[in-house]
């Protein structure tokens, strides 16, 4: 390994050694010896030793069933520990500058000064900075909350061990603690035994807020404030809220029958309870800190004659929080209380605390004001009284079904059979009407009642409790108007952001005309108060058309929507539904944001962060601060130094590449008669459905083929066997055809000068690096019937051909040569992933031999799936 990663290497080997000791103590020498043999053979096989490769396959074939789980768990744990060491390395004092831009904002300010961007414009852009991260449950977030807490503690130990002035006694104590944590992880269940409920998923999200984001937000704002102050001469306003959070956990009912209006209500109560609980800790700390006696008149008026005025103000806040917690607790435990929790708005906390803050500054105690008190004020702005705002997501057909059932009941026809024009006419008339639409004697079907009950829950809460109402599979203007009407009928007293999600290739191409149509309805313009949110779906478009065509459709849709927004004079927020993987839009955030169309980040950034990516990007306070810095610097750069408008010849070539790649992708996925049976045999797709991973079923339609599979299991399955097909199929082929037609020079120019195109190629390189032709081939040999194998050979040959094509256009010798850290990080994990792949192929072979496989085989299989997911990083 490269000498410059010596600190990381030594942490990985120390954690590996401690894990080895744990395995030996728990499972004996035999298992440890097996693990070591497999690790060494795998390393040698990776280096190209064919004889050792054969030995490795035999070694795994000969493992008795009862040894499979401990061996699989060993490699799974190695990977988790490697991930921890790597994540820690990015925030450690030994971290190299190319690994992590430690001062992204500072570098940006230097660039702005060099390009003579006015300080006035910079100040304006900082004031408008708006990053909203939307936490979503991930059906494949395999790490349990129990494990996540242990990972945080392991990180703390690594941090302690890095201190050079640690006494031998302290060092020994920390190493001992590390050993205990690794042993605790080894003896805990890596995998959930039951599917998590939507409530479990929401609690997982709250754990991330409590363990990381709660600490990261004030820290990030403190750093940003200092940098802004030194560059512009004045810091951030005290009520700045550049970063805040929403969540889909407990609100996303699209295809998830387990998320009901009762669950949503419970999650809303739980998030308020958790917020009050966290503020109570803050207030208790402030009560002990703010013992000062000197204050200004405003605080004196609030505190009366009390000797310690600040404490006099804080104590009633403490009581308010305690009472809120008690009432919410009772409601969560099913008690029917008529009384409301006293803490209703953020101002109840903000106003008295801000008065204390001003008083401390006026009385010469600014240094005290700018400590814990300022942190709490920053949190109040970022988290409010709801901690995270809840998005509600539902599929468009469910809203149409409500109105259709209603119009049939009223005897005015079937809404679902009407033309789009008639639907719009009906909806706008009703939105304009003062009389209620829902008759009292109407008994809706249970499905329809559920949608109406959800709208009532929204209407009963304050506006701050919710983010957006997202309509999945949105196709028409009536899809958006229908939701506004249902919310109005439920008596919703505020305007909620109703956000259409355009997710297939056709829907992305039609997004502009749908929004334009809405903007031409005067009533609608008044309704939305000049603000429209639109969500761009990454996963379904890539599944539908392949990454190259989907990426270009997303770009063009964003560009067109920005134009519609400008023409209509409305503020547009684009909401990005990215996943962790390339096939679902996941790219290194900084590069991805800078490759978006000019002006597309003017309304700020709203982006989903999913399960396992939440853990990698936001799971530790220091890592979260880095992520916020990266997002902030990318948005500021995109808005202050916008990327060039693409040249017409770039666009024309992109149109061609998009069409060719889409056809090449669909020719295989839809047109190849052997494709579905091959996919089912070569990947663990069928087995994945049985795993207790997320609360949501893996298919929208339980009987359908590939098209009915959700985008996440579709990509997840392919990343398990290391072919990662959806993330590259079609792209290289299209580029090769363009080269054959004489476009090599133009492609090279696009690669050099157009961030959109160079980012696409960079993402492909990362996927190619994670693919393994030899592993994918091994799955075929072990699992696929001989008549289907030629398809696998064809796909692997295409992959190898595509890699050469992309390197040729980039004028590169090797994959990821411009990203040595990314390359190293993948290399480091591959050492442990490959044995897991070999084990998984063997386990799939054994479980498919019988109708009722032994439970120990299924458990071992789940461990390999979890391990490979942890190793591949962006699982789905």
UniProtKB/Swiss-Prot annotation:
The active site consists of 138, 543
InterPro entries referenced in this protein's UniProt entry, alphabetically:
PEP_COase, PEP_COase_bac/pln-type, PEP_COase_Lys_AS, PEPCASE_His_AS, Pyrv/PenolPyrv_kinase-like_dom
The record's Gene Ontology cellular component field reads: cytosol
PROSITE patterns with a match to the protein in the record: PEPCASE_1, PEPCASE_2
Q: List the disulfide bonds.
A: none
Keywords for this entry?
Answer: Carbon dioxide fixation, Lyase, Magnesium
Task: State one Pfam family annotation.
Answer: PEPcase
The record ties this protein, via NCBIfam families, to: PRK00009.1
The broad enzyme category this protein falls into is: lyase
Naturally occurring in which organism (per UniProt) = Vibrio cholerae serotype O1 (strain ATCC 39315 / El Tor Inaba N16961)
Family statement drawn from the similarity comment of this UniProt entry: Belongs to the PEPCase type 1 family.
User: Which reaction equations make up its catalytic activity?
Assistant: oxaloacetate + phosphate = phosphoenolpyruvate + hydrogencarbonate
| Entry's Gene Ontology BP terms | carbon fixation; oxaloacetate metabolic process; tricarboxylic acid cycle
Can you say what this protein is called? Phosphoenolpyruvate carboxylase
Alphabetized GO MF terms: magnesium ion binding; phosphoenolpyruvate carboxylase activity
What SUPFAM superfamilies would the database entry show?
Answer: Phosphoenolpyruvate/pyruvate domain
Superkingdom as given in the UniProt entry: Bacteria
Name the cofactor(s) required for activity, per the record.
Mg(2+)
Q: What is the annotated role of this protein in its UniProt record?
A: Forms oxaloacetate, a four-carbon dicarboxylic acid source for the tricarboxylic acid cycle.
Stated EC number for the protein is: 4.1.1.31
């Amino acid at each position: 390994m490269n000498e410059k990663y010596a600190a990381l290497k030594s942490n990985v080997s120390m954690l590996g050694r401690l894990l080895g000791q744990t395995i030996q103590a728990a499972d004996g020498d035999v298992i440890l010896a097996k693990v070591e043999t497999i690790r060494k053979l795998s390393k040698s096989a990776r280096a190209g030793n064919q004889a050792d490769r054969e030995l490795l396959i035999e070694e795994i074939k000969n493992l008795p069933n009862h040894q499979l789980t401990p061996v699989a768990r060993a490699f799974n744990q190695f990977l988790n520990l490697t991930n921890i060491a790597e994540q820690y390395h990015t925030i450690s004092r030994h971290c190299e500058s190319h690994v992590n831009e430690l001062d992204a904002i500072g570098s940006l300010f230097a660039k702005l000064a060099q390009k003579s961007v006015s300080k006035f414009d910079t100040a304006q852009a900082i004031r408008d900075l708006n990053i909203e991260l939307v936490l979503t449950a991930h059906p494949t977030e395999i790490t349990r909350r129990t494990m996540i807490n242990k990972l945080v503690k392991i990180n703390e130990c690594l941090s302690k061990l890095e201190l050079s002035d640690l006494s031998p006694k302290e060092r020994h104590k920390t190493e001992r603690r590390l050993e205990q944590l690794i042993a605790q992880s080894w003896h805990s269940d890596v995998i959930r035994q039951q599917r998590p409920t939507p409530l479990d998923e929401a609690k997982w999200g709250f754990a991330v807020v409590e363990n990381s984001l709660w600490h990261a937000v004030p820290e990030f704002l403190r750093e940003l404030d200092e940098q802004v102050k030194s560059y512009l001469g004045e810091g951030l306003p005290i009520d700045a809220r550049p970063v805040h959070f929403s969540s889909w956990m407990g609100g996303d009912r699209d295809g998830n029958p387990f998320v009901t209006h009762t669950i949503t209500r419970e999650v809303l109560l739980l998030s308020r309870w958790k917020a009050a609980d966290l503020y109570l800790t803050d207030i208790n700390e402030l009560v002990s800190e703010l013992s000062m006696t000197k204050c200004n008149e405003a605080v004196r008026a609030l505190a009366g004659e009390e000797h310690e005025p600040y404490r006099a103000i804080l104590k009633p806040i403490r009581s308010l929080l305690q009472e809120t917690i008690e009432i919410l607790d009772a409601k969560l435990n099913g008690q029917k209380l008529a009384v409301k929790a006293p803490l209703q708005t953020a101002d109840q906390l903000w106003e008295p605390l801000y008065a204390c803050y001003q008083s401390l500054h006026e009385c010469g105690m600014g240094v005290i004001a700018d400590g814990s008190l300022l942190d709490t004020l920053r949190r109040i702005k970022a988290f409010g009284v709801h901690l995270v705002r809840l998005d509600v997501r539902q599929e468009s057909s469910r809203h149409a079904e409500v109105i259709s059932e209603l119009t049939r009941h009223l005897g005015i026809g079937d809404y679902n059979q009407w033309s789009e024009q008639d639907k719009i006419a009906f909806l706008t008339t009703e939105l304009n009407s003062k009389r209620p639409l829902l008759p009292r004697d109407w008994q809706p079907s249970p499905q329809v009642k559920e949608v109406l009950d959800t709208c009532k829950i929204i209407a009963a809460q304050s506006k701050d409790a919710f983010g957006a109402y997202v309509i999945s599979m949105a196709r028409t203007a009536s899809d958006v108007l229908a939701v506004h009407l249902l919310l109005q009928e439920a008596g919703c007293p505020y305007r909620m952001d109703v956000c259409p999600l355009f997710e297939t290739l056709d829907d992305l191409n039609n997004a502009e005309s749908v929004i334009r149509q809405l903007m031409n309805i005067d009533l609608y313009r008044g309704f939305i108060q000049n603000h429209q949110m639109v969500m761009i779906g990454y996963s379904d478009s890539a599944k539908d058309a392949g990454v190259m065509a989907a990426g270009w459709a997303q770009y063009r849709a964003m560009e067109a929507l920005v134009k519609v927004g400008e023409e209509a004079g409305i503020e547009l927020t684009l909401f990005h539904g990215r996943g962790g993987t390339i096939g679902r839009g996941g790219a290194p955030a900084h590069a991805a944001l800078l490759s978006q169309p000019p002006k597309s980040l003017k309304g700020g950034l709203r982006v989903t962060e999913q399960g396992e990516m939440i853990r990698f990007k936001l799971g530790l306070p220091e890592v979260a601060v880095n992520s916020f810095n990266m997002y902030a610097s990318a948005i500021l750069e995109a808005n202050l130094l916008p990327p060039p408008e693409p040249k017409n010849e770039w666009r024309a070539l992109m149109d061609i590449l998009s069409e060719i790649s889409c056809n090449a992708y669909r020719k295989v996925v839809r047109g190849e008669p052997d494709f579905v049976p091959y996919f089912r045999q070569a990947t663990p797709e069928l087995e994945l459905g049985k795993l207790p991973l997320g609360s949501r079923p893996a298919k929208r339609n339980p009987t359908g083929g590939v098209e009915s599979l959700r985008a996440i299991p579709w990509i997840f399955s392919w990343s398990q066997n290391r072919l990662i097909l959806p993330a590259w199929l079609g792209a290289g082929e299209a580029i090769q055809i363009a080269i054959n037609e004489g476009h090599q020079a133009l492609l090279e120019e696009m690669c050099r000068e157009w961030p959109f195109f160079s980012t696409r190629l960079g993402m492909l390189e990362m996927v190619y690096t994670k693919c393994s032709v030899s592993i994918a081939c091994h799955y075929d040999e072990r699992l696929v019937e001989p008549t289907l194998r030629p398809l696998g050979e064809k796909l692997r040959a295409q992959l190898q051909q595509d890699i050469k094509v992309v390197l040729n256009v980039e004028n590169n010798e090797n994959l990821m040569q411009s990203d040595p850290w990314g390359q190293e990080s993948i290399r480091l994990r591959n050492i442990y992933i490959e044995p897991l792949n070999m084990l998984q192929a063997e386990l799939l072979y054994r479980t498919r031999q019988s109708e009722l496989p032994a439970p120990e085989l299924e458990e071992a299989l789940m461990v390999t799936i979890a391990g490979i997911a942890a190793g591949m990083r962006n699982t789905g």
